[in-house]
Amino acid sequence: MRSYTLLALAGPLAVSAASGSGHSTRYWDCCKPSCSWSGKAAVNAPALTCDKNDNPISNTNAVNGCEGGGSAYACTNYSPWAVNDELAYGFAATKISGGSEASWCCACYALTFTTGPVKGKKMIVQSTNTGGDLGDNHFDLMMPGGGVGIFDGCTSEFGKALGGAQYGGISSRSECDSYPELLKDGCHWRFDWFENADNPDFTFEQVQCPKALLDISGCKRDDDSSFPAFKGDTSASKPQPSSSAKKTTSAAAAAQPQKTKDSAPVVQKSSTKPAAQPEPTKPADKPQTDKPVATKPAATKPAQPVNKPKTTQKVRGTKTRGSCPAKTDATAKASVVPAYYQCGGSKSAYPNGNLACATGSKCVKQNEYYSQCVPN
């Protein structure tokens, strides 16, 4: 059920923030997201997409890679990652009661999980896709290894099918090892921070989009500042989308046509997606029912904390950010830091030298600027 909270604005207009309770599923179909087409909502630019080599595409009319001969796919850095033990960031395909793409494309929502092993944890997601086969207040979370669902753009993007069931994806963390390098981190996230939760329920509220998500998608709603800022802890270990995020920021600005802030929501393109499926799935392709294809350069993506594997069935897709093992200085004098906190560093940056990780975790390089303690 969805409710609305009226927020007073400085101007004459008021914007209602969506909130309520909902259900999640998972997917990763590699398809171009629906919100990557122009004219879906009043935004500065459509969500970014990438070619099969994970390079940002500037042509918002590029054909969906899930269609024959298509060249636009979801960028691998649309993979989820842990901000700290209790908060994660990511992207999703959505269908919100009483809304439409004009109201949810590129909008951000703070989810608080209410069931399963992640009960009590929070995740902020940006909606980059629309689920034509989803029910009301249904969020199809993008996570590599979650299953491709109705559409499969991964086979054409990577030259081979990704492992796992069409709905639900893989069932063990070790299966992530067979995935393309750029998808492994996001795949591991599912079994680590997300604890292999199987389609947990949640409560949600619309919030301002975190810069880290905007840097990846390159898409910001004109009314984003009208919504409340997330009040939870976002500091702990902030593995912001590494180079990929930075790359996307500039890529987003240069690659996508900008819209004026005053532009009203544009009419959405007619959808050409197939019908619903056996499990909550994700829409795939063109306007209205395309899959979220976050456009962000692949290169480097915020690495996800690696935790303990779990088994589960999910709904869709697969992709992820790449990660590089960080070097740890065995002779570092710095005091040890807990899992998911920043580690490594040099004497010039830290008075005590290299920051070592606590027993049971190792220092993993997320990008050229940041390393994080990840459980063994």
Swiss-Prot record:
Active-site feature positions: D29, D140
Annotated CBM1 domain residues: 335-374
SMART domains: fCBD
Enzyme class: hydrolase
Chemical reaction(s) catalysed: Endohydrolysis of (1->4)-beta-D-glucosidic linkages in cellulose, lichenin and cereal beta-D-glucans
Keyword annotations from UniProtKB, A to Z: Carbohydrate metabolism, Cellulose degradation, Glycosidase, Hydrolase, Polysaccharide degradation, Signal
A UniProt-annotated Pfam family: CBM_1
Region (Disordered): 229-332
Family annotation (PROSITE patterns): CBM1_1, CBM1_2, GLYCOSYL_HYDROL_F45
EC number: 3.2.1.4
GO biological process: one example: cellulose catabolic process
Region (Linker): 309-338
Biased composition (Low complexity): 235-258, 291-306
GO cellular component: extracellular region
Family: Belongs to the glycosyl hydrolase 45 (cellulase K) family.
Name of the featured protein: Putative endoglucanase type K
Organism name: Fusarium oxysporum
